Each structure stands twice: as C-alpha cells, then as structure tokens.
C-alpha cells in the first residue's frame, strides 16, 4: 500500500518506469532469450502508430518517442541481459496542471492517486498514470511480438467500440494472421472501415465540446499451443 507497482509477467518480466513530465520514461524486459534478432525499424513503426500529435483523435502533445537502448542489445540481437530502453520527455507544460491538487479531473487517476499516495505522487500530466507510459509498453510489445512470430504466434487488436459505435468483432474461431498484420499496420485499426469514420466523427464531436469519450479494444492471439498458460 502506498507503492506504485509497474511490472508484469513471470518468465518474461516487464517493468515500466518514469513519469509523464519527468526527464524520461522507459522499460526493462528481463528473461528474453539471448540471440534473438530485433528489427528496430519494425519497432519504430509501432512506436509511430502510438505517438501522439499526428491526428485529431489523439492528444496534441508531440514527442519523438525515440527509444534509446541502454543494455541487453548488441549487433542487432538480444544479449540475454535485461533489455533496458529510455524515451526522453521534451514537450511538457507542467504549469497546466498546477490546479489539479485542488480540482482533480473527473475520470482520471488524480483523486484516487492523491489519496493512495498521500499527496506525494507526481500529478503533472498524470505522473505515472499518464497515457505517456504506454510508449515504453509499446516498445516492449513490439520487441516481444517479433520473438513470438518466430515461434508461430501472433497478436493483434482493433478498436471494438467507441461511445456506442461498434466495429465488427473478431470471429472467435477464425482469426487469421493476415488480418492481425493488416490491423497492426494502420493508425486507427478497425475491421470495418465505415466504423472507423463514424468513430472518428464521435471523437471530433466530443473534442469540440471539450469532452472525451471511452472505448473498448479487442485483442486476439493466434498460434498459441494448446495447454499454454495457467500453473
């Protein structure tokens, strides 16, 4: 209690660190096999999909999201040591958040975090609860996806719904690797392209009113061997 925990996994262990308006954010991946080739161009393609400031549907904050690998990677391959990468923060406007300690934003972590961490948490930009922290998570996911693909496993996702507008759901018994690849190449991934246009219109309308709306993401994995998971 009173400790922010940002790590997941057992055999592959991911720790995400940093805060929205701190000097940097980053990720540490432990347990990666040595000798795994990582194509950094493919990693950067996924980082670009997440990066804000390029579209009205995303936050206007612009960051380069250029991960700098500090350890665990040499000559294009993993070394077996923890893979650590940092992403510098540059476009911060901390003065915009000076009133949050008195007026928490509805629907955000401001108030519960203030209570749980006794007011010592960094509230600037949401601190460690900011969407900014998805950048190192995407880096880690892009690395792990390449390793999984060499083992015949792939993972992908699409926007299932936003504010009452629904996309076509995955067929629970027939999700193809080709579909997952197509979705992972698009900035706003939907199976039904008409749904994307309607969702964008809903987001634009909320943005015009100074509001925000929620959504649901559906994820699928293919090629997982039977019996995987659990104890």
What residues fall within each predicted segment?
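Generic N-terminal targeting/processing segments that precede catalytic cores or assembly contacts
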Residues: 3-134, 138-231
């Amino acid at each position: 209690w009173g400790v922010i925990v940002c790590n997941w996994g057992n055999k592959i262990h991911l720790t995400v660190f940093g805060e929205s308006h701190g000097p940097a954010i980053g990720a540490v991946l432990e347990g990666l096999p040595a000798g795994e080739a990582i194509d950094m161009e493919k990693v950067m393609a996924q980082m670009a999909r997440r990066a804000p400031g390029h579209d009205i549907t995303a936050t206007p904050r612009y960051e380069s999201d250029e991960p700098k690998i500090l350890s665990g990677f040499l000559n294009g391959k993993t070394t077996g040591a923890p893979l650590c990468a940092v992403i510098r923060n540059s476009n911060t406007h901390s003065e915009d958040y000076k009133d949050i300690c008195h007026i928490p934003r509805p629907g955000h972590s401001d108030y519960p975090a203030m209570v749980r961490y006794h007011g010592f948490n960094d509230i600037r930009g949401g601190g460690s609860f900011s969407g900014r922290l998805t950048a190192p998570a995407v880096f880690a996911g892009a690395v792990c996806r390449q390793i999984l693909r060499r083992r015949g496993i792939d993972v992908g996702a699409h926007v299932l719904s936003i504010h009452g507008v629904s996309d076509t759901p995955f067929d629970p018994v027939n999700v193809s690797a080709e579909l997952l690849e197509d979705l992972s190449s698009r900035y706003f991934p939907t199976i039904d392209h008409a749904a994307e246009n309607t969702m964008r219109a809903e987001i634009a309308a909320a943005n015009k009113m100074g509001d925000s709306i929620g959504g649901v993401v559906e994820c699928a994995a293919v090629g997982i061997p039977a019996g995987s998971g659990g104890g």
